[in-house]
A protein has these predicted regions:
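Juxtamembrane intracellular "pre-TM" segments in multi-pass secondary transporters
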Residues: 1, 179-208
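Helix-loop boundary and gating motifs at the non-cytosolic
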Residues: 2-42, 203, 216-223
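Helix-breaking motifs and short loop linkers at transmembrane-helix boundaries and internal kinks
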Residues: 35, 67, 88-93
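Residue-level signature of mid-helix packing/kink "hotspots" within the transmembrane helices
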Residues: 49-57, 141-142
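Conserved MFS/SLC helix-loop-helix module at the cytosolic interface between two early adjacent transmembrane helices
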Residues: 54-87
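Paired small-residue
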Residues: 82, 93-101
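Cytoplasmic helix-loop-helix junction between adjacent transmembrane helices
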Residues: 100-137
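C-terminal membrane-cytosol helix-exit motif in multi-pass small-molecule transporters
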Residues: 165-184
Length: 223
């Protein structure tokens, strides 16, 4: 594993930590901030998921037409700007718009990050590299959620937002330090499901969805 690869793993960990610092906290802060029911605030997460998947068919084109690292950094920057907006959201519409923008950019940033990680890993080490890279995301989720709860208890919601943005900026710094060799565009279509929805991946994807569903439902309720 090269230094560039470890920089990408660190950037991935920080990116996921940044997003998951806010996720558990938003579920009970937004109802108070906006004066609406918890179930209605949950629409934000549905908007995030829908937007994240909506960006998928365009990922292959963007990473072919533009530099992969630039797609990652640009998406992460807009995502962090949307996350900062949660501190100032004062209506249901603004909440949904912020969640949608965050979802699109998070989807593009994570998929571009995976592409960069694969590009900088030798073919003989890609299986091990993919495993390490995936674990960096999992650790980022856990660390981010724990840090979010702790900061909220000690300092309040806005501190969590600012800390999440700061962590994301640090992740962008590590990603910007990665060297990615130039690859000539191959002329992919603007919208394509070829590298997004693979028929043989549906069963593992469903398995991961069901496993992640349990802690996703329980964590906000337990708090």
């Amino acid at each position: 594993m090269t230094l560039n690869f470890w920089r990408m793993c660190t950037a991935n960990l920080l990116l996921f930590a940044s997003v998951y610092m806010l996720f558990p906290v938003l579920s009970f802060v937004m109802p108070e901030q906006l004066g609406m029911s918890v179930s209605r605030t949950g629409d934000m997460f549905l908007a995030f998921i829908a937007a994240m998947f909506a960006a998928g068919p365009f990922h292959a084109y963007l990473c072919d037409e533009y530099k992969r690292k630039n797609v990652l950094l640009s998406s992460a920057f807009v995502m962090l700007a949307a996350m900062a907006g949660y501190a100032f959201a004062d209506s249901y519409l603004k909440l949904m718009l912020l969640a949608s923008v965050q979802g699109v950019c998070f989807g593009l940033a994570t998929t571009a990050g995976i592409t960069v990680a694969i590009d900088i890993t030798t073919s003989t080490r890609r299986s091990a590299g993919n495993l390490v890279y995936a674990w960096s995301a999992r650790l980022g989720m856990l660390a981010g959620a724990c840090a979010g709860f702790l900061l909220y208890d000690l300092y309040g919601f806005r501190t969590v937002v600012y800390a999440a943005v700061a962590v994301g900026v640090l992740g962008m710094y590590f990603a910007s330090r990665v060297y990615v060799a130039f690859r000539a565009p191959i002329g992919l279509r603007l919208c394509s499901l070829d590298r997004f929805l693979l028929p043989r991946a549906w069963v593992p994807a469903l398995n991961m969805l069901l496993i992640a569903f349990v802690p996703g439902v329980l964590l906000p309720l337990l708090y």
